[in-house]
A protein has these predicted regions:
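Sec-dependent N-terminal signal peptides
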Residues: 22-25
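TM-lumen/periplasm interface segments of multi-pass membrane proteins
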Residues: 8-10, 14-17, 27, 31-138
Length: 151
């Protein structure tokens, strides 16, 4: 048993091919979970009464207010909540609020230029692309400085 734990701690078993394989398996599981989550939702509201994309709804609502020429209303909680509800046809949704600086309206107005589901997809894809870019940069840096550090 000691040999097993030593092998696990060393990290030698985790090859690049295994890391890619495990990552793809995890990605497939997440894709299935998201598909199931969307399948059991009621329109754009999940089973818990929250919007799909939860706090993205505040970004989309603020962008909608900006398109209507009323961006300052995003900083008024009651008006922002009303805008969040309006995104979902007036249904009761949790209040997420707008806590971003004014320059973030530039992002909000872009995602609010399309229907909510498309805006959410764009938001998630852009976030994931940024995540991958950072992970790639970290990976390159760690390859240059590869040092064995036992646990």
């Amino acid at each position: 048993m000691t040999h097993f734990w030593q092998g696990l701690r060393s990290g030698r078993w985790l090859t690049a091919a295994r890391a890619r394989g495990y990552s793809l398996i995890l990605l497939a599981i997440c894709a299935l979970a998201i598909t199931g989550w969307i399948a059991v939702s009621d329109g754009l509201i999940d089973r818990n009464g929250k919007p799909l994309g939860t706090d993205f709804s505040n970004v989309y609502a603020a962008g909608s207010l900006t398109w209507q020429g009323r961006p300052a209303e995003a900083y008024e909680p009651a008006l922002q909540h009303a805008a969040e509800k309006a995104v979902f046809g007036g249904r009761e949704v949790p209040f997420y609020g707008w806590h971003y600086p004014p320059f973030f309206f530039a992002v909000a107005v872009l995602v609010a230029a399309v229907p909510y589901a498309w805006g959410l997809a764009i938001w998630l894809a852009a976030s994931f692309a940024a995540y991958l870019a950072v992970m790639r940069a970290i990976g390159r840096a760690s390859c240059r400085e590869r040092v064995y550090h036992p646990v």
